[in-house]
């Protein structure tokens, strides 16, 4: 699937609906302004325009399967952020000594909490929040040291697993730093996981201790604790919950403060602790798989340090003046890596949540301030779904403007798009037109980092223009510790994920079945392989899957086979153009196994054949269906629809009726809500080997089916 499509400025311009005479006058003013500012900015603009076309990565040899490296690491890959700091505890010690009394972790105080009754009768919790309260580097270090000591007192052993199942907050990072210091292997689980997945992760890793929050203990863990027989200690980061009678014997609940108090006592007794080695496991990060059972990725200290080294080198002027807003799940490699990059460079990290991020967020009481308005971050990571939501909300506001205001916005938008393509800035547009949009994220954002799924060219360009900052689109996997590529801040091209980071190299492997070869012209194509110190140790207790996805070359370098298909542009930047596997990550981050969806539905009497399709730019699954002629004709008769076979298949009413049947079957088959096709296309023609849509063995040819139904895909997903 073509996840990344390069778009020129002309194809993304907004349409104007303004009186032609007034339009000519405004264009005259803009032209006059451009001429007057052209000469002073000429040399600066020219250099900026040339910069995006510079070579950013190149192959290390002339062979077709040669790896590409950043031009800054052709002679050797980077693996250490600071000399001598080869484990995460040493990195934090270095940062603590350098930025000792500087603010590090910030949390907003809850001033008031209210229940607000909605028109439909539902009750929403609304909060009024105060200012950020900050912990310094020294504060965090002492709390982590005491907490680690306290965990030792509870029986936690070095190189033994300990789980964290908690929302993104300062206590999460403090607990993680404690584990890194004391060489406890931190098992991370998403706070959104369902009961069976949580039980699987806890039992597979044989944890005896788990760190969580009061809310998650009451809403998620309470019902499954009895299914985790080795569990002995539960540590809540925000106070002790009420006891319940069904709580299993032998399991003790502690508060984080109480465990830290134990640690203070241990400090007085000078109890020594084990130090990690670079090769030791730092994190076992659970990630979704095609079967729905999460897999634990083993990530060493050296993996994480190499990854954050590569990421940090792609962020210019990173330092003490920067403020990062943390709200994505810390159990996700993108957020954990981003926060560790900030922590190691003296940046402040202020915590938030998707429900309190902006003034208009769902939990913020009307009239009070969201987190971005108070924190005013300079750096922010986001997944495409959040950026798409911002794009849609702003454009809805634009459409509600008066005709004059709307057209002024559109003129400024299109003008800035043209200037960006030339490498020029637009200070007047930024100041007078886009200032209010920029304030949605606090007004100080200088870099947005996007990862987790592909970002559409339209949304990327919108964020560039309206928030007056670059969008660094990255590509990486949990298995590569999140590191792979990130676009340069001065590269405003869309549809690409940038050049390899200095910590890794990337090569393309032929995929004959898909028709992708590293000898393809005009650009090499193939399966993306990532090599470097950031490539992880493999899957926990899953040697077979590890051997499938990882290998070591003759030089001892570890490589990851991603299953994604890429293409290198002449300047060394990577595009993601297809996916080898039928596992697709939706825009919100859920993984959908297309084969699983098809298997659940293809045996229905109404269905002769089905192909599920999902695109990472969107949040739902669609499908192409060859209906059984007899069953569909009968369904049409019972619903009162008439017409020829082709007319029935092309009828939107019949599509909806078939969709109802599919949805019921999907629920019966226990498919998740996000796995159920939301829209379908009925095909009047069967898929045979002669059509080229299936193999001789009648296996689906996904690439050909996508091409065949491209117009229907665009219809079902709609255009931006």
Curated annotation (Swiss-Prot):
Induction: High expression in ob/ob mice (obese) and mice fed at high sucrose diet.
Sequence ranges on the Cytoplasmic membrane side: 42-720
Transmembrane parts of this sequence: 21-41
One GO cellular component, as annotated: Golgi apparatus
Keyword Aminoacyl-tRNA synthetase: no
InterPro entries attached to this UniProt entry: AMP-binding_CS (IPR020845), AMP-dep_synth/lig_dom (IPR000873), ANL_N_sf (IPR042099)
Membrane topology: Single-pass type III membrane protein
Record's catalysed reaction(s): a long-chain fatty acid + ATP + CoA = a long-chain fatty acyl-CoA + AMP + diphosphate; (E)-hexadec-2-enoate + ATP + CoA = (2E)-hexadecenoyl-CoA + AMP + diphosphate; (5Z,8Z,11Z,14Z)-eicosatetraenoate + ATP + CoA = (5Z,8Z,11Z,14Z)-eicosatetraenoyl-CoA + AMP + diphosphate; 15-hydroxy-(5Z,8Z,11Z,13E)-eicosatetraenoate + ATP + CoA = 15-hydroxy-(5Z,8Z,11Z,13E)-eicosatetraenoyl-CoA + AMP + diphosphate
Keyword Lipid metabolism in annotation: yes
Cofactors named for this entry: Mg(2+)
Record EC number: 6.2.1.15, 6.2.1.3, 6.2.1.2
Pfam families: AMP-binding
Major place of residence: mitochondrion
GO BP annotations listed: long-chain fatty acid import into cell; long-chain fatty acid metabolic process; positive regulation of Golgi to plasma membrane protein transport; positive regulation of phosphatidylcholine biosynthetic process; positive regulation of secretion; very-low-density lipoprotein particle assembly
Similarity annotation: Belongs to the ATP-dependent AMP-binding enzyme family.
Primary role: Acyl-CoA synthetases (ACSL) activates long-chain fatty acids for both synthesis of cellular lipids, and degradation via beta-oxidation. ACSL3 is required for the incorporation of fatty acids into phosphatidylcholine, the major phospholipid located on the surface of VLDL (very low density lipoproteins). Has mainly an anabolic role in energy metabolism. Mediates hepatic lipogenesis. Preferentially uses myristate, laurate, arachidonate and eicosapentaenoate as substrates. Both isoforms exhibit the same level of activity.
Protein name per Swiss-Prot or TrEMBL: Fatty acid CoA ligase Acsl3
Naturally occurring in which organism (per UniProt): Mus musculus
Gene: Acsl3
């Amino acid at each position: 699937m073509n996840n990344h499509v390069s778009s020129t400025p002309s194809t993304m311009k907004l349409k104007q609906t303004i009186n032609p005479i007034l339009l000519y006058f405004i264009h005259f003013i803009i032209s006059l302004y451009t001429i007057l500012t052209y000469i002073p900015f000429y040399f600066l603009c020219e250099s900026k325009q040339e910069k995006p076309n510079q070579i950013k990565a190149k192959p290390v040899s002339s062979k077709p399967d040669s790896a590409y490296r950043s031009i800054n690491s052709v002679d050797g890959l980077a693996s250490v952020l600071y000399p001598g700091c080869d484990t995460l505890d040493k990195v934090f010690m270095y940062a603590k000594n350098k930025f000792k009394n500087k603010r590090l972790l910030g949390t907003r105080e809850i001033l008031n909490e209210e229940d607000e009754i909605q028109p439909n009768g539902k009750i929403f919790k609304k909060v009024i929040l105060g200012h950020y309260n900050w912990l310094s580097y020294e504060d965090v270090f002492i709390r982590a040291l005491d907490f680690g000591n306290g965990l030792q007192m509870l029986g936690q052993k070095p190189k033994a697993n300990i789980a964290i199942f908690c929302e993104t907050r300062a206590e999460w990072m403090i607990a993680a730093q404690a584990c890194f210091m004391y060489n406890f292997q931190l098992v991370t689980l998403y706070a959104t996981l369902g009961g069976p997945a949580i039980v699987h992760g806890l039992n597979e890793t044989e944890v005896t201790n788990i760190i969580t929050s009061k809310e998650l203990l009451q809403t998620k863990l309470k019902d499954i604790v009895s299914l985790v027989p080795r569990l002995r200690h539960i540590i809540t980061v925000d106070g002790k919950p009420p006891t319940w009678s069904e709580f299993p014997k032998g399991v003790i609940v502690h508060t984080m403060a109480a465990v830290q108090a134990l640690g203070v006592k241990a400090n007085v007794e000078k109890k020594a602790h084990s130090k990690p080695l670079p090769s030791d496991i730092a994190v076992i990060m659970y990630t979704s798989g095609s079967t729905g059972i999460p897999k634990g990725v083993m990530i060493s200290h050296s993996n994480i340090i190499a990854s954050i080294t590569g990421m940090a080198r792609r962020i210019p002027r990173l330092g003490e003046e920067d403020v990062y807003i943390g709200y994505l799940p810390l159990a996700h490699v993108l957020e954990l890596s981003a926060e560790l990059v900030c922590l190691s460079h003296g940046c402040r990290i202020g915590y938030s949540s998707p429900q309190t991020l902006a003034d208009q967020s769902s939990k913020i009481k009307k009239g009070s301030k969201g987190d971005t308005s108070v924190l005013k971050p300079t750096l922010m990571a986001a997944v495409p779904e959040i950026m798409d939501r911002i794009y849609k909300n702003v454009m809805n506001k634009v459409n509600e403007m008066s005709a004059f205001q709307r057209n002024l916005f559109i003129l400024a938008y299109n003008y800035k798009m043209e200037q960006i393509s030339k490498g020029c800035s637009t200070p007047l547009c930024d100041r007078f037109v886009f200032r209010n949009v920029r304030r949605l994220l606090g007004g100080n954002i200088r870099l947005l980092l996007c990862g987790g799924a592909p970002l559409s060219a339209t949304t990327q360009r919108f964020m560039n223009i309206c928030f007056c900052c670059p969008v660094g689109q990255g590509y990486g996997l949990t298995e590569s510790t999140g590191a792979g590529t990130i676009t340069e801040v001065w590269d405003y091209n869309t549809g690409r994920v940038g050049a390899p980071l200095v910590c890794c190299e990337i090569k393309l492997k032929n995929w004959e079945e898909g028709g992708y070869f590293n000898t393809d012209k005009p650009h090499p194509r193939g399966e993306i392989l990532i090599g470097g110190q950031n490539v992880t140790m493999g899957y926990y207790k899953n040697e077979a899957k590890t051997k499938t996805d990882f290998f070591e070359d003759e030089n001892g370098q570890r490589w990851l086979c991603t299953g994604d298909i890429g293409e290198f542009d002449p300047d060394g930047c990577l595009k993601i153009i297809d996916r080898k596997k039928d596992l697709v990550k939706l825009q919100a981050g859920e993984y959908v196994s297309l084969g699983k969806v098809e298997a659940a539905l293809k045996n229905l009497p109404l269905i002769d054949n089905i192909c599920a399709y999902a695109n990472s730019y969107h949040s739902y699954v669609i499908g192409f269906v060859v209906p059984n002629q007899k069953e569909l004709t009968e369904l049409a008769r019972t619903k009162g629809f008439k017409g020829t076979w082709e007319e029935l298949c092309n009828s939107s009413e019949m599509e909806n009726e078939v969709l109802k049947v599919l949805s019921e079957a999907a629920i019966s088959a226990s498919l998740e809500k996000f796995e159920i096709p939301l829209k379908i296309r009925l095909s009047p023609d069967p898929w045979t080997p002669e059509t080229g849509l299936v193999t001789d063995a009648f296996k689906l040819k996904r690439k050909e089916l996508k091409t065949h139904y491209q117009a229907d895909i665009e219809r079902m997903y709609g255009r931006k």
